[in-house]
Amino acid sequence: KPSHMVMPAIHLNRKQCAKFFSDELKEDIPSDIPYMIQTARRVLREEFLKADMGITGANFGIAENGAIGLVTNEGNARIVTTIPPVHVIIIGYEKLIPKISDAAKIMRLLPRNGTGQRMVSYLTLIDGPTPIIHEKEGKLVEENKKVYVILLDNGRLKAAHDDKLKEVYQCVRCSSCLNVCPIWSTVGGHVYGYIYSGG
């Protein structure tokens, strides 16, 4: 179970990670970090290539043009959005912003506050289906991907108009609150018993 929104395995040391890999993959994985990274890359890419559907969230959605933005350091989100023929995006109403110019602020804020970076390794903007070129009966054919966007309410719209809760809409889930929280640094994220851990 993740303990941190941006760094979900921060509570594990390399030996615990190796045990997790070994248990999941049913093979002996050494606690060598570069080896584990290569193993994760190999296994995940095999799964991505076989997938009929990729499901992602989004760091923001732009009302002006309907685009969504994904901000990552690993590149997995880009693979999930491009290889499978169907892409499903699940995004909460609180992540919708008016204009593309507003996205620039979030793109500066997230890496700085989340991981102390100037910019992330991968920034992906998606504003509709992209063509997929593949071989069919000896010929290269072009087909459009299918992209579905699910807007998640779950009380979000009501919270936006509540004087006590509307401040929650300012959260971009960078986790900087966790990084400076003395309680979180003492007890960790698991004691909160929910997806979002204190802070």
Question: Locations of the language-model features?
Answer:
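Iron-sulfur-associated redox domains of electron-transfer enzymes in respiratory
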Residues: 1-160
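Conserved structured core elements
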Residues: 38, 97, 165-171, 175
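Hydrophobic alpha-helix feature that most strongly marks membrane-spanning transmembrane helices
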Residues: 105-111, 115, 173-182, 186
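Ferredoxin-type iron-sulfur electron-transfer modules in oxidoreductases and energy-metabolism complexes
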Residues: 136-168, 178-179, 184-199
